[in-house]
């Protein structure tokens, strides 16, 4: 598309953000407790983006902030079990839209 912002840009950004959140959860589970600097190094993500994702994940109750660093909460396992199903629902919905 030429000129202006594509109406799809925000969708792509949200999908990218969701992927970052999921990656951050996986690394946190594997290396917990883990701090912002280490998460930034491991994931290759700027610290400000790590802080943002941690804030969102904490708000959703998926991680817990401790003095030693972030740790996953009891909700982690259930959330990760639901990820494939939720992604499949998105794919089905996108396929439906593309056929209309």
Predicted features and spans:
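Short alpha-helical segments that sit at the start of domains
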Residues: 1-24
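Short helix-capping/hinge SLiMs at alpha-helix to coil transitions
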Residues: 28-31
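Short acidic, hydrophobic short linear motifs in intrinsically disordered regions
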Residues: 33-42
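Residues within the helices of the helix-turn-helix
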Residues: 36-37, 55, 68
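Short amphipathic alpha-helical interaction segments
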Residues: 44-58
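A short, conserved structural fragment
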Residues: 58-68
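Minor-groove-contacting beta-hairpin "wing" of winged helix-turn-helix DNA-binding domains
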Residues: 68-75
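Amphipathic alpha-helical dimerization/coiled-coil segments
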Residues: 77-100
């Amino acid at each position: 598309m030429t000129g202006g912002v594509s109406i799809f840009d925000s969708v792509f950004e949200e999908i990218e953000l969701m992927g970052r959140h999921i990656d951050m959860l996986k690394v946190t589970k594997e290396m917990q407790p883990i701090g912002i600097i280490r998460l930034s190094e491991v994931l290759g993500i700027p610290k400000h983006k790590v802080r943002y994702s941690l804030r969102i994940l904490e708000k959703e109750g998926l991680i817990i902030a401790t003095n030693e660093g972030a740790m996953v909460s009891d909700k982690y396992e259930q959330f990760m079990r639901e990820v494939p199903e939720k992604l499949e629902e998105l794919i089905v919905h996108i396929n439906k839209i593309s056929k209309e």
